[in-house]
Structures are given as structure tokens and as C-alpha cells.
Amino acid sequence: LPNPISIAQHAEGARAELDELSFDARVFARAVPARDQTAFRIAEATNASLEPLLAASTAQLFVDGALVGRSSFDAVPAGGEIMQAFGPVEDLRLRYAVLDRSAGDRGLISRSNARTEEVRMTIENLANAPWDIEVMEAIPYSEQDDLVIEWTSTPTAAAENVDDRRGLIQWDISLDAGATQEITVEQVIRWPDGMVLR
């Protein structure tokens, strides 16, 4: 430390600022309507300094000068990527609804079984500013030749198998203040007669 600091008797410790680094960051919201009714603020940046960022078991998180939470912080090498969540975005509301779900025999000749499902995700921006949002949904995938899975979405998904995770799809939307976006996903799962889907 450049200067000595004082620690009060019986205190757990003291905080001292060692350095300050600033990076240009992409700030967006990540939403998983099937799991949560709230989206979360994410900041993504590159460590453009010539030094690594040290890991911390506890880091305080601030947004516009206000403390929003605490989190662990992993070490980041020079030139490495930083991705950090900064708590929920209360002005983004998420809804998830199953519109149709059916199962049974399909076809008079082929005698195949099928299950269909249609879901709708609704994202509403109650803030007075626009938000860029990554919306994620998990869909089933097949590891057997006899099991056929087809799906469509409106609007079309921007990415499939996100981060090499099979069945994870993503939409990238920009939502103006006060605007609402709906996403629908239809799935059809087919399997031969005589087999049981588990």
C-alpha cells in the first residue's frame, strides 16, 4: 500500500483501493422465462490492461454508484474476457405460458406416436430506456435415430446450441421503452409405434 491505514480494534478488516481500471463493456439483459420472471443485467468486457485481474472470494457490485450485491470474482488474464452479472433488472418482466400440449397416435397408416407443444414467452420493458436482451430457452434433442424432434420459432432464433450446450437456443432482441416482445416455440417429437418415450 502507498500509505498506511488504520484498522479499528476488534474490526474484521479494512478495504483499500489498490488500483482502478476502466474497460468498455457491453451491457445487456439475459432472460430465461421458463425459469424466472426476472431478467438479469450482464456486463461483458475484455481485460485490455497489460496485467491480470486477481480473483476475489467476495467482490462488491455497483451499478451507477449504487451497491447491488456481492459475488465471487474469477481471475482474468491480460486480454481475457470478463462476464459478470449485476443483479436483476426489475423493469423487465417475463412471462411463460404453455399454449398447447398434446400426445397420442398420429397417422392412419404410419402408426407413429407424436407429442406436440407450443409455448409463448413474453418480455415487457417497463423502463424508460431501451434494453438489449438475450432470451434463452431449452428444447429437447435426440440421441437416438428413432426419435425425431422438430421445432420452429417466431421470430427465428439467433443461435442454437449456445456455448456448445445442446438444445439451448437464443434470441437477440432490442426492446424499446414500454415495448413488449412475444416469442413462440413449437415442438414436435415423433417416435415409432411400439416404443415408449421416457
State where each predicted segment sits.
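Intrinsically disordered, low-complexity Ser/Thr/Pro/Gly-rich interaction regions
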Residues: L1-R120, A129-D163, L168, L175-R198
